[in-house]
Regions:
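Bacterial N-terminal signal peptides that target proteins for export
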Residues: 1-9
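Sec/Tat signal peptide C-region and signal peptidase I cleavage site
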Residues: 17-23
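Cleavable N-terminal signal peptides
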Residues: 10-11, 21
């Protein structure tokens, strides 16, 4: 009797494990490809490029003005038009402006990163929502990004389903 119970329990356990293994469904998406095809990304890239050009123009203006003033001061020094005290004042002024330019360069990079996050976050959220919808509708337990998959069957690629959800 105990033997029959043990065997029955073993069969039930094996049946449950096989049912669980067969029920799991995995897929993958090529998120980089999906993002590259989205018009929103193209618009965000365009906005970032415009901001970068604007900031670069301002930075270049600051550098050109600095170089012009530096050249003028050097000419005055060469002609003997500046006293040692005035030379020191001008040197301090140029040094503070150089620090200002360096700060601007750092702020420019920070602005670009912040703007990129601001523009891309809603797009990434939209793609993630579409992936979640496809997963729920298709009964997928997990969907991976193709960038992390070394091999995957073509049938497991749900990129086209996600593109359809996104309207691309």
């Amino acid at each position: 009797m105990k033997k029959i119970i043990k065997i029955s329990f073993l069969f039930v356990a094996i049946f449950c494990m096989t049912a669980t293994l067969q029920a799991q469904k995995f897929g993958y998406v090529n998120s980089a490809l999906i993002l590259s095809e989205m018009p929103e990304i193209k618009q965000a890239d365009s906005n970032l490029e415009a901001l970068q050009k604007q900031l670069m123009k301002k930075g270049e203006g600051m550098v050109q003005l600095f170089q012009k003033d530096y050249a003028e001061i050097q000419q005055k020094v060469a002609k003997g038009e500046l006293s040692p005290v005035q030379q020191e004042e001008q040197a301090k002024n140029l040094e503070s402006r150089q620090i200002e330019i360096q700060k601007f360069e750092q702020e420019m990079q920070e602005q670009m990163v912040a703007k990129r996050e601001e523009l891309y976050k809603p797009i990434y959220d939209k793609v993630n929502d579409a992936i979640k919808q496809v997963a729920k509708e298709g009964g997928y337990q997990m969907i991976f990004d193709a960038a992390t998959i070394l091999y995957g069957e073509e049938g497991a690629d749900v990129s086209s389903l996600v593109k359809t959800k996104l309207g691309i």
